[in-house]
Amino acid sequence: MRNVENPIVKKSFSFAVRIVNCYKYLVKKDKYLLSLYNQLLDSGTSIGANISESQAAASKADFRNKLRISLKEAYETEFWLKLFYETEILDKKEFNSLLKDCLELIRLLTSIIKSIKLKA
């Protein structure tokens, strides 16, 4: 199942890079909120890590489960992005850009998960 040219693999990796860069910026800006920043870093990079792991899944069920974990992490990331925007940790431009990419991953993951047919 491994395919590095797969669009969701590429998009989730690019998103993880953006999250890491955002994290580095936030830590330089204000170290007092490090525990919150770590939450964003963990969930935002976990999306791509689980998608990558799904590429070596042992079965369709395993593949789907890894993608479900990625979807949960994407929803968590959406939460942290919204919280950071509402509390003025992220500016509107950065928030909108990251949120757009996060929502695209949510749509892609949802579509892929729905399309996976398992034997009853």
Task: Report each predicted region and the residues it spans.
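Short, C-terminally biased terminal segments at protein or domain edges
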Residues: 1-53, 57-120
